[in-house]
């Protein structure tokens, strides 16, 4: 379950970065 949460956080961070770049 921890792994899933970690991956979800990474995706969120990636999304935020992509939004910031755009």
From Swiss-Prot:
One GO cellular component term noted in the UniProt record for this chain: extracellular region
Keyword flag Manganese: no
Record's subcellular location: Secreted
Region called Disordered, residue ranges: 1-22
Compositionally biased residues, Basic and acidic residues: 1-15
Keyword Transferase in record: no
UniProtKB keywords: Disulfide bond, Secreted, Toxin
PTM comment, free text: Contains 8 disulfide bonds.
Tissue spec: Expressed by the venom gland.
GO molecular function: toxin activity
Assigned protein family: Belongs to the CRISP family.
Record protein name field: Cysteine-rich venom protein notescatin
Lineage, opening ranks: Eukaryota, Metazoa, Chordata, Craniata, Vertebrata
